[in-house]
């Protein structure tokens, strides 16, 4: 049985971008209808309950300075923030040696260099800093609206980040630290990503240190009640009649005087058809490319989706009765070249109970460990925690993980990235409407691309595009 519905604008995807676009359209007096494949809203933002009314964020979670759009939206919805726990000494495990320090790795204070010297030489830290400064200078030359128009766009887009790092660093340790940072920000390896994409993304986020930093950086704060509160509240405001869950869009007919979206109906054998004046596709480019379009999309747009793979990440939470590491003067933050969780944060609730160690498996290690049994992954992650924080870390009360590449309607995280040649050959198609079809999603943002703030920007932009177009129509 096929249910038939009509709307002014059909929106594919109930993540932040799709819900913000719907909100903008509703404010303009239009009737949007959001179709979401999952049985929930939020997309790559997801809370998991851990008891006592508390949650951990198994998807996107942080907000930092300069992310004005998501900050304003959260404030309007009444969602407050609290600081990521950053007090105490951070741990770094490198080449089989361990050091503790306070501050950021890119800080050049003498006391930090001294503290780190057991694991990382002063020469390697200086090497890292000179390359980071050069990278930031290059990034500022990349136009955020048109990365392909950068002065050396083709040269930069024709090489991987790995190639650039090898040419611009002198120490193996600095190269390894750039690898760790690439995994942490893009959930990919330096060999996977175009240098131009790294530069665009760095400029988009306000500099390399801001991307990787906690205090003063992109990981500075979290949301009370978890980040998924924001899309949940947006969906509540939108109203159930404007949102359909369990409705993956399979085919979009577009052209003439409207669009027709064909989706599953939520029950076995059921189908849903939505007729609208225009459509916004607010899912990652990889997933947008899996929808069938009639007529087919222009070659440039279709091939773009073939050249924007998603990163790979497994997000783990080891949950303890209390954050015992704090009593030992540790922040809970750690970086390790051994892994498998190479980046660790204290992800405890704001009152510090229970204690939560968040461990990320990213890039190559996420691909390797994602193919292994869950029990084996858990054992390896906890062994790494114990190596860093002591044997007590090997015995959590509960262990939670999310393998985002296994999610049918996600297939990876944190977001899509550009491979070599992607920006200069296909980038013009990323945001450009195709007739009655418009594109949204964090990857299409020009500021804080790939982040929740970028998702909000993209939803506002796509909603405004369509509202203006329908005024003319």
What are these regions (language model features)?
Residues 1-473:
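FAD-dinucleotide binding site
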